[in-house]
Regions:
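Positively charged, helix-rich recognition surfaces that bind polyanionic ligands
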Residues: 137-430
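Acidic carboxylate diad motif detector
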Residues: 1-131, 310, 314
């Protein structure tokens, strides 16, 4: 009663939020989580009801889908050019027109061993976002079944799916891949010069915010410039608040660009094959700061604890790996993570031996003198996996190497010719 009378909320919203809280507690009790993360002051809310008939009710009208919250009716609008959303709305409306018939058909097909997509709306969420200074509210509808394939205006598929193995070596900033038809070495999450431009702009804004914060709160700092300990009441000027809004908008645009770039890369990889082979993800481990046993070097200076946090934040290799797994498994493909003993970065097929290499050694020579790029060669060894997906197929390595090596040389020549800088690749373009 208190929830309804004091906050004007139904119990279904509390139930939905309780599930999120319990999921977070489970990560602390039974997984690698360490602490709970609460909403910050100023964060926009997300309203979700885990039932489509309570709280946020999903219904149909003459104009299309609508979401009802009490006496408030929210029409679902989208751009007319978005054919995928049009197809999705059409499928949801078809279910809402005859839900009993659609459910009976799905149960009948399941008894025959066939799983069909009903497009039943499960629940809805209202997500608030601030875009270019304006508050926008989006309706997220969770639908039962697989998403409809995207198409063009002439009804042809927007994305095509290939066949065959794709060996991918995913680094902190780059991705190297080898398939039956193409080899490649690219920067992760890059759309033009977006990352370099955003980094520069973000540094300038943060520097200006720091100057403003120090000018408005001079008593909060020691003589050496460090912040005093203890609880403090901070004063922020109007200029600081405007800079903070600019910084939030810049981070939002950078996030969107990273997500779009990664989805484009994953869709391209899916067009090359249907079996994605890679190593287990380790971005979370590389993101943490180093903790050396002896923190002091031989000269008496403190060792640096910096690792790959900034690169992983800008390039998001873990997000690419998660999206690849989701796309390949949902479109009839396979996602394979090789065992730790596979050691694609150490094997040399010309001498049939494992040779450890320094992390800084990006270009190296095989035992027979052939010069290869390290990341691409690792992706080639992942491509040459056996039928049980556990070990390297040495016969396949030897028989296909000449063809793939020529493609690798053509790829490096194209990178040098275009002048594109591939991070940590060892390829000099100037």
């Amino acid at each position: 009663m208190e929830l309804k009378e004091k906050y004007h909320l139904q119990s279904i919203f509390a139930l939905s939020r309780a599930e999120d809280i319990w999921a977070a507690i489970e990560t602390i009790l039974y997984s690698s989580g360490r602490k709970l993360h609460f909403k910050k002051r100023g964060d926009l809310p997300e309203i979700r009801a885990k039932q489509s008939t309570r709280g946020l009710v999903i219904d149909s009208s003459q104009s299309g889908l609508i979401v009802k919250y009490g006496k408030v009716t929210i029409p679902c609008k989208y751009k007319a050019k978005d054919l995928w959303l049009w197809d999705e709305e059409k499928a949801i409306l078809a279910y809402l027109a005859e839900p009993e018939l659609q459910d009976a058909h799905a149960v009948d097909q399941m008894s025959k061993g066939i799983i069909t997509d009903t497009y039943r709306p499960c629940f809805a969420s209202l997500v608030c976002k601030k875009i270019r200074g304006r508050l926008r509210v989006y309706v997220h509808i969770t639908v039962e079944g697989k998403a409809i394939s995207k198409r063009r205006k002439d009804s042809t598929p927007r994305h095509y799916y290939g066949k065959g193995n794709i060996g991918c070596d995913i680094g902190t900033q780059t991705i190297a891949y080898t398939s039956n038809t193409e080899v490649g070495l690219e920067n992760l999450a890059e759309r033009g010069n977006s990352i370099q431009h955003v980094e520069r702009q973000e540094a300038l804004i943060l520097r200006a915010m720091e100057r403003s914060r120090r000018a408005m709160n001079p008593n909060h700092y020691n003589e050496n410039g460090t912040v005093k300990k203890g609880h403090k009441q901070w004063n922020f000027s109007k200029r600081y608040q405007k800079l903070r809004q600019r910084h939030q908008e810049l981070c939002r645009i950078a996030t969107e660009n990273r997500a779009l770039a990664i989805r484009e890369q994953v869709n391209h990889l899916r067009s090359l094959g249907d079996c994605f082979i890679t190593e287990p993800p380790n971005a979370k481990k590389l993101q943490k700061r180093a903790n050396p046993e002896n923190p002091v070097d031989k000269n008496g200076r403190m060792k640096r604890k910096k690792r790959f946090g900034r690169s992983i934040k800008n390039r998001c290799p873990g997000y690419l790996q998660a999206k690849a797994k989701q796309l390949f498994e949902s479109t009839g493909g396979m996602y394979v993570e090789v065992p730790i003993l596979y050691r694609a970065s150490q094997y040399d097929h010309t001498s049939d031996s494992y040779i450890p290499k320094k992390l800084s050694q990006r270009m190296y020579h095989l035992a027979d003198g052939t010069k290869v790029q390290r990341d691409w060669y690792s992706s080639y060894l992942l491509y040459c996996i056996n039928k049980t997906y556990t070990q390297i197929n040495k016969l396949k390595c030897r028989s296909n190497f000449a063809t793939m090596y020529q493609k690798e040389k053509n790829m490096i020549e194209e990178i040098i010719r275009s002048g594109k800088k591939i991070m940590n690749s060892g390829i000099r373009t100037v």
